Amino acid sequence: MIINHNLMANNALRNMNVNSNNASKAMEKLSSGLRINRAGDDAAGLAISEKMRGQINGLNQASSNAQDSISLIQTAEGALNETHSILQRMRTLAVQSSNDTNTTTDRSAIQDEVNQLTDEIDRIANTTEFNTQKLLDGSKVGLVDAKDADASVQLNTSANISLASNFSTTSATGIADSFTVTITRTHGTAGATFASTDYDVALVGGTELIEHSSSSLTYDTKAINLVGMIKCFSIRTNDTIRKVSHVRTVKALSMQIGAIVTNMLIGINSMKATDIGVRNTSGKALDISTASKATGAITQINNAIETVSTQRSKLGAYQNRLEHTINNLGTSSENLTSAESRIRDVDMASEMSEYSKNNILSQTAQAMLAQANQQTQ
């Protein structure tokens, strides 16, 4: 007979505690709805689900960012819609002024309206903003101009049509074998490239000086056969091609549309009257005081309408892309949420069954403990 230990009571007590703890854990899971409430429940599962939660939160915020970006684009596009309406009105006035049935007084009145409309274009460009950020004043173009860059080319010709070069910029000097000449204009770039490696000469955008069906050029003692038309720039000796006398650094809008690092740059050109071509550099609006000037103004206004249309098309493309981005982010977030749920969320039916089992076992163990304590040792 054993008198120091009641083994049956100890066994019943141990099982009762185990079942009670299991029932308590099951109740915690049922009350929280989570299978993992602490790292001890599933250490690996907790680590995986936390990474997923971070990505899900990032995707949801990226979707919100994309929505904000669309709102910004809609703000800019709405302002440009009004700019378009103003330009259409200005074109109508220019067409009206080009008719000689109008007197000088009539054209003066028309000019006054054109002046006011031009001022309104500038006001829209200077005041349109989203969350205090200017959108149409040229501060969101995303381009950087060079600083004080002078490019000089010296062309010497002889009977053999030979070419000598002396080219320098702030970044490169003394280019002996090859060089590239670039002329930057308001709406584009025309370039001429000379290369000594294969001795091809490509000249684009210059003034036509020579035209032959075929000719021969000598460059560095090697012959170049050109068939067709030869075009080159009309450049005086040591003529300066381009000089940029200022620095203008502007920044495009960077949109964070991904959970990690996915930036989208949105550039918006200046929509000021001068930049779209309906105000000259001296600050005067288009002159429609005569029929001939009004006719010329129509062409300038047409170009301005095309410029604004191009910018609105870009904004529309940005918006369409962002809408697809939002759809993709939503799908990704939904799939990751489903995966995270399978790891972390509790199966209510299964856990309820587990709780009922452990609760019954705990009650049974408690009853058996009472019986064991009454047994003869």
Swiss-Prot record:
The keyword Coiled coil does not apply. Keywords: Bacterial flagellum, Secreted. PANTHER family: FLAGELLIN. Flagellin is the subunit protein which polymerizes to form the filaments of bacterial flagella. Pfam families: Flagellin_C (PF00700), Flagellin_N (PF00669). This is Flagellin. GO terms for molecular function: structural molecule activity. It is found in: Secreted; Bacterial flagellum. The keyword Nucleotide-binding does not apply. Belongs to the bacterial flagellin family. GO terms for cellular component: bacterial-type flagellum; extracellular region.
